Amino acid sequence: VVVQPLEHGMIDRLNGQDCLYHVNLQGKENGKPVDTTTRIDVISRALNPYTQFEAFMALSEQPDMRFVISNTTEAGIAFDATCKFTDRPASSYPGRLVQLLFHRYQYFNGAHDKGMIIMPCELIFLNGHRLKECIYQYIELWKEDFGNDYEGFKEWFTADCYVCATLVDRIVPGFPRENIDEIQHKICYKDNLVVKAENFHLWVIEKAENMTVAQLQEEFPAHKAGLHVLITDNEKPYHMRKVTLLNGPHTVLSPVAFLGGINIVRDACEHPLVGKYIRKVQFDELMQTLDLPEEELNKFATDVLERFENPFVDHQLTSIMLNAFPKFETRDLPGLKIYLERKGSLPQGLVMGLSAIITYYKGGKRQDETPILPKDDPKIIEKLEELWSTGDTRKVAEGVLAFDYVWHEDLNKTIPGLTDMVKEYLDLIQTKGMLEALQSIL
């Protein structure tokens, strides 16, 4: 059963197609193109809790209902103190979930085997921990509404419901407008809800505190279906792996490749110089900062490169460049610091990437006359304009690295040698061009 998170959405269209739709997976696997279309027929019905509140609450009365899986966006897991228990429904997702759970608790008289396994997929680090906090906040907020059932319900939720933290990893562009006619011809009817996604998928599920990994594997045996679902007792290393080996290289390859005359990620990976640079950053630098088994990291990094080289997706470098400084701060700076600590030297590839970001924010035009149009927080744009207006790369390097608004520290002082290396690379890019500057570190 699908429950719509917002008052207005796609429920009517989904029900209008008898809850049937297709998923078109495209990408590379073992170096070969993959393009499959599969009909999804596992949804029995779709509900709008704003217009079908009774039907929504009745879901909790089904004895075999065991899992709640959500994806309400990052803003969805939030506590709203204005929500009332008597709202039909509560305006927030955690509030609606508590309404559902309390009804189930009462309907089954607090039966221990009627708890729910809850798996949020929102892109928040340790999303399950945050959701659990919100649930407890609502339990306290609505304490008087629960009356004599307050203590019992709270104990039942704590002991018999299982809130997991998860990490989802799959690029889903959505409705394939560019080739929908071809897909509809292939499936022989008009599906207006086709979803396009890459073939790669990974779902890491951190078991709830009150259960074991073995218990969750038994209840949710996704591996038997051949799905890449990893059940663990700690999601953090996998979160760090994704941020470090997928998002990290993305952030630095984009300015380097764009300034080198390239426009899409796939072409960057296939470029003899930029492709070599990406592998240097990924395998020689960022991978060295993680503490998972080397074989596992190599496999993940290789999969990431296949994803970057997806022949079906033209991923524009300029779209990745949006908010590049905050992205570098969260995705690459931690690895730069760990690399320096472990190796005793600065990672040239990451520093070159940072220097390319700084150069990108100078604006202007590429050699082929393509405009360079940085997009970021106005404070960051203004700061870079001010620094570049000096015409002094030493002042640019020092000013950027001292910019507390981005780094929350003065990198000139906290990372020895970084200022000089950034200045050196800025000079190289200005005088030799991006590709020749890149050649100097490969």
Question: PLM features: what roles do these ranges have?
Answer:
Residues V1-L442:
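Substrate/ligand-engaging "lid" and interaction regions
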